Design a protein with these regions (language model features):
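C-terminal cap/loop subdomain of S1 sulfatases and analogous C-terminal strand-loop tails that border
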Residues: 2-5, 9-98, 149-153
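Long, internal low-complexity/basic segments
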Residues: 16, 21, 81, 86-92, ...
Length: 173
């Protein structure tokens, strides 16, 4: 029986699939599907929390990491380290207690240096295990977004157009 109300249990997007599969009575897939290798599902089944059997899914020592275009985060227990790259941030890691400071206004990295370093090490482990690539120097999200949009819109034609522009430009200058 699903419990009504709000839970304070930590959950992440990766937990949705195992939870739905659990409620549907479907086993998690193995390492192969239709003869092809598949990546493992990394999330956890939230049904014990949703059924009122547990108040948390992740133990205090377990970590959940995430990275997108250089912005990165690692959750562990009540804490979170986060880095936001320019222009949204300054590229500096920060530590927050997300239970007592959900607005993330009080950076605890200087007050809790040991926890901060342990979580940075945890993020490096996440990065290595998940083959997260470091961004090249000078990386710009906006430039990459623009480049991807051009490539999607014009495909291989964009390369031909740029080369033609380079060849023909001297005749117009």
């Amino acid at each position: 029986q699903l419990q009504q109300g709000l839970t304070r249990a930590f959950a992440w997007a990766t937990d949705i699939t195992p939870t739905i599969l659990s409620f549907a009575g479907v086993e998690l897939p193995g390492p192969r599907y239709a003869g092809r290798p598949v990546l493992p599902i990394t999330g956890k089944d939230l049904s014990p929390v949703l059924m009122g059997e547990s108040d948390r899914i992740y133990a205090a020592h377990e970590t959940v990491g995430y990275e997108l275009t250089g912005h990165a985060v690692l959750f562990q227990g009540d804490y979170k380290i986060v880095v936001n790259q320019p222009p949204a941030g300054d590229g500096q890691w920060r530590l927050y207690n997300i239970v007592t400071d959900p607005g993330e206004t009080d950076d605890l990295s200087a007050q809790q240096p040991q926890r901060f370093q342990e979580m940075l090490s945890g993020y490096e482990t996440y990065k290595r295990e998940n083959r997260v690539l470091s961004l090249p120097p000078g990386y710009s999200q906006m430039r990459q977004l623009f480049s991807n949009a051009l490539q999607e819109r014009y495909g291989a034609n964009i390369t031909v157009m740029i080369l033609a522009l380079i060849v023909l430009l001297p005749f117009f200058i």
